[in-house]
Amino acid sequence: MKKMFRRVLTLLLSVFVLFCALAAAACGPGEEDKEKPTPSEGKTVSRIAYTDAGKAYLEVDGNPFTYAGAQIRIDGFMDEEHQSIDEMERYFKLAADMNVTMVELPIQWKDIEPEKDQYDFRNVGKLLGFAQKYGLKVELLLFTVNVCGMSGVAPNYINQDAKTYPRYPSDLTDSTVAFYEQDNPNLLERESLAVEHLMSAVADWCEVAGENVVIAVQVHNEPDVFPLWRLQQYNVMTLDGSRRLTDMEAWEETLAALDTIGKVVKNSEYKVVTRVNTAIAWDAAWEAFVPDIYELEGIDIVGDDTYNETVSVNKEVMQNLSSGDLAGNLPHVAENRGSYGSSASLILAVFCMGGGYDIYDLITPKVFIEDWGWVDEGIIYSYDEDDPSTSMKDKPHTDLARRVLYGVKNAGYEMTLAPVGDIAGFNLKGNYPETSCEQTVDTSSVRITFSTREGALAFAIVRGGYLTLFSTHAAQFTLSNGTFSGAELGAYGTDGTFTASGSVAMSDGSVSLEGMQVCRIKIDSTDGSLTSTAVENIG
């Protein structure tokens, strides 16, 4: 009954907000105009699709998309370090050099609506231009009313009008930060308008650019932190101050807000996949709430900010996020610390488990570390204007992660569509690859024996009558349980076309790769089915 009541309430609230949104004023990118163009049916840029075997994947412009991203904290660089919008370009180049396919960009409400009904998307357009220049797609992170359980990024007119936009009494002493009543109709109306205008501006920009650069939207950021931690941490009270807000009350309004804003994106003229990142999906005490998010009409997929450096834990998260009540979800690591030395193994393991991976972050703003006491979480050394020798340099583990991402990117079409049991990862038993490793893994039809003396991480994918191989460093693959021919080197395009750039010798089913080579081999025949051991050889 409680869930049914919540759904009915959410539906009524969503209808009210959408009615208000359609009746309110709007403006275009970089303009201050209260005229709103008539809403159109728009277009669907991305969606969650499924293979015949039921594997979920992200489809962009009709093609499978490899979900490999890195977050760029443009808010930290611009707000706290006072870097210019033009200086943000260097971080996009770094992302492209890391071989990720997309970047996650925080979009703060106060930046796109500095004054009530006055919208400014010029910086958003600049950022999309940088992404397009370096061949990257973009996921927008909506930093609005719930950012890690609170908000300090709402426009001043929201923050200064507690009567119209109520916030809960608490022990917070910073007047610029608030615990808003997230499902308050007045607040949701304004937030919905801002998101609607944002998506309209994105649609206009992408139409002019001739490319759909934005492919997903994250609704809020770690919204579960509000009921999980903030209530007790800051003694958050009901609006009348008579008692503490319960975690269930907090959870219900969090769900309602997520659903409403997600629907705004999905009903916009530029329709993309919506997702939510949770802080605690793998925590047994709270995982029961994750399916509630997944069930929301406005949210397509749910990921977890694992912040864990072990392969086995990240593997388990992928399994939990794609089974039981979450069957059909696209499992993904929504954030994981880029500074982990095991990053390369973590990334490969997650992709072998059928998931996606977002690095948090590409490079950590200096002010976060020096002034705020944050850990350096970047996969690249933080920018240090005082010491050019350490300015945006690799960490010891960066190159191996870059190599893994190269393979994932250039074999992404096959990895995205292949069943998990037909993606064999090698040298992934531990958190770090062993320098010398020999390992045999069965897929559903091909047995592969892998060996390296150079600490290579590697994978093999069986799909559609072909076997795709990749290793970060020199390695040998010996194939059995069938006959094989035509070992070609090259890469897969976004439409699945394999473009050959050379060939490699194959003798008695054995192929030696130098490293950083994607190899496709024809499977002429197999000697019957095998029981896959791919999953058990991870972690």
Q: Where are each of the predicted segments found?
A:
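Sec-dependent signal peptide cleavage junction
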Residues: 20-40
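Active-site-adjacent "subsite" loops/lids of carbohydrate-active enzymes
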Residues: 124, 145-203
